C-alpha cells in the first residue's frame, strides 16, 4: 500500500489530503496573523520579492494553493495601480481558505478580474496551455504528490509560460541553521497553541518544512516535469527560496 509523510508520521497516501485540509480549515481565521508572528513579518517581504518575478501584469495568471489570497491580492493591487489588464484565477483545495481570500478581496476592493476555483493542484480543471504564469507560494510541500502537481503546472501553462514557486528551503549557514531549527521546533508550535489553540497544526507545519527537498533536489523534480531554464534564488539565507522555470 502506498505511504507518504504527514509531517514525520507515515500515513496512507490517500489520507494525506484530508488531513492537510483539516489543518488549514482549523487555522484559517488566524492564518494571516500566524504568518506575521512566525516570520516576524518577513513573509511579506518574501512575497513582495516573489511577485517581482512577474514583470508583465497584462497576463492570465493561475495562483495555486492560494490560501488566504496574499499573492493574488498583491498582484491584483499592483495591476490595478498600473492599469494593467490582469486575469487572476485563485485555486485552492480548501474551501475555507478560499472563503478568506474572497472576503479579503472584497474588503480591499480588489475582487475585479478574480476567479475562485476549489481544486486540487494534482488535478486542475483547466485546459492545456491556458495560463501565462503559474504561481504557488508555501503550498507545494502540502500536496500529496508533488511530482503530479508539477506536471499539472506544466500542462496548464502556455508555451513560454513561467512557473514560479516560493517555498521554505534549506538553510546553508550552520549558525543560522541551528537557530532556525530550534525556533521552528520549539517556538512556532507554542505560538500556534496560544493563537489558534491548535499546536498539532504547527507541529505539522515545521515537520513538513524539514522534510521538503533541498533547493537542488527540487530543481531536479521541476526538470523531470518537463520545465527548462530552471533557477532558484535564496532569501534570508535559504530559509525560503524562489524557484522559477519555463515551459519551452
Swiss-Prot record:
The keyword Cytoplasm does not apply. The keyword tRNA-binding does not apply. Its EC number is 2.1.1.163, 2.1.1.201. Pathway: Quinol/quinone metabolism; menaquinone biosynthesis; menaquinol from 1,4-dihydroxy-2-naphthoate: step 2/2; Cofactor biosynthesis; ubiquinone biosynthesis. S-adenosyl-L-methionine binds at residues 68, 92. PANTHER family: 2-METHOXY-6-POLYPRENYL-1,4-BENZOQUINOL METHYLASE, MITOCHONDRIAL, METHYLTRANSFERASE. Methyltransferase required for the conversion of demethylmenaquinol (DMKH2) to menaquinol (MKH2) and the conversion of 2-polyprenyl-6-methoxy-1,4-benzoquinol (DDMQH2) to 2-polyprenyl-3-methyl-6-methoxy-1,4-benzoquinol (DMQH2). Belongs to the class I-like SAM-binding methyltransferase superfamily. MenG/UbiE family. This is Ubiquinone/menaquinone biosynthesis C-methyltransferase UbiE. It comes from Rickettsia bellii (strain RML369-C). The lineage of its organism: Bacteria, Pseudomonadati, Pseudomonadota, Alphaproteobacteria, Rickettsiales.
Amino acid at each position: 500500500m502506498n505511504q507518504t509523510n504527514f509531517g514525520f508520521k507515515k500515513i496512507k497516501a490517500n489520507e494525506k489530503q484530508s488531513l492537510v485540509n483539516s489543518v488549514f480549515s482549523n487555522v484559517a481565521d488566524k492564518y494571516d496573523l500566524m504568518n506575521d508572528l512566525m516570520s516576524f513579518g518577513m513573509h511579506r517581504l518574501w512575497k513582495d520579492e516573489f511577485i517581482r518575478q512577474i514583470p508583465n501584469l497584462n497576463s492570465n495568471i493561475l495562483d495555486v494553493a492560494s490560501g488566504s489570497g496574499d499573492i493574488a491580492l498583491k498582484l491584483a493591487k499592483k495591476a490595478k495601480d498600473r492599469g494593467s489588464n490582469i486575469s487572476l484565477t485563485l485555486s485552492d483545495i480548501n474551501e475555507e481558505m478560499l472563503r478568506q481570500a474572497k472576503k479579503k478581496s472584497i474588503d480591499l476592493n480588489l475582487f475585479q478580474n478574480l476567479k475562485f476555483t476549489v481544486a486540487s493542484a494534482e488535478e486542475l480543471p483547466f485546459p492545456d496551455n491556458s495560463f501565462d504564469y503559474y504561481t504557488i507560494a508555501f503550498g507545494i510541500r502540502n500536496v500529496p504528490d508533488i511530482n503530479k502537481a508539477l506536471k499539472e503546472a506544466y500542462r496548464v501553462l502556455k508555451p513560454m509560460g513561467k512557473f514560479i514557486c516560493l517555498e521554505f528551503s534549506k538553510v546553508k549557514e550552520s549558525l543560522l541553521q541551528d537557530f532556525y531549527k530550534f525556533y521552528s521546533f520549539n517556538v512556532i508550535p507554542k505560538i500556534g497553541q496560544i493563537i489558534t489553540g491548535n499546536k498539532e497544526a504547527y507541529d505539522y507545519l515545521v515537520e513538513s518544512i524539514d522534510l521538503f527537498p533541498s533547493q537542488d533536489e527540487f530543481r531536479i523534480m521541476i526538470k523531470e516535469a518537463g520545465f527548462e531554464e530552471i533557477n532558484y534564488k535564496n532569501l534570508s539565507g535559504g530559509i525560503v527560496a524562489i524557484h522559477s522555470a519555463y515551459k519551452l
